[in-house]
């Protein structure tokens, strides 16, 4: 391992002037297809529009 990389890993977090340290390995997360997100958004928008016609706003 190069010495410059080793020095960067040994730097304490408090002395990094407020920089956030992100780790290389990510935890497994729920993966959703972009198509599912778009379709769900359209369905939600349509539901809100339909509900606004069915249920009148309070006076």
From Swiss-Prot:
Residues 1-35 are cytoplasmic. Its main location: membrane. GO terms for cellular component: plasma membrane. Residues 57-59 are extracellular. Keywords: Cell membrane, Membrane, Protein transport, Translocation, Transmembrane, Transmembrane helix, Transport. InterPro entries: Preprot_translocase_SecG, SecG/Sec61-beta/Sbh. It is a single-pass membrane protein. It is found in: Cell membrane. GO terms for biological process: protein transport. Belongs to the SEC61-beta family. HAMAP family: SecG (MF_00751). Involved in protein export. The function of the beta subunit is unknown, but it may be involved in stabilization of the trimeric complex. Component of the protein translocase complex. Heterotrimer consisting of alpha (SecY), beta (SecG) and gamma (SecE) subunits. Can form oligomers of the heterotrimer. This is Preprotein translocase subunit SecG. It comes from Sulfolobus acidocaldarius (strain ATCC 33909 / DSM 639 / JCM 8929 / NBRC 15157 / NCIMB 11770).
């Amino acid at each position: 391992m190069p010495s410059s990389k080793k020095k960067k890993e040994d730097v304490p977090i408090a002395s990094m002037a407020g920089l956030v340290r992100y780790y290389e390995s990510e935890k497994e997360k729920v993966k959703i297809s972009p198509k599912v997100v778009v379709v769900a958004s359209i369905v939600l928008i349509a539901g809100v529009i339909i509900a606004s016609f069915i249920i009148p706003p309070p006076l």
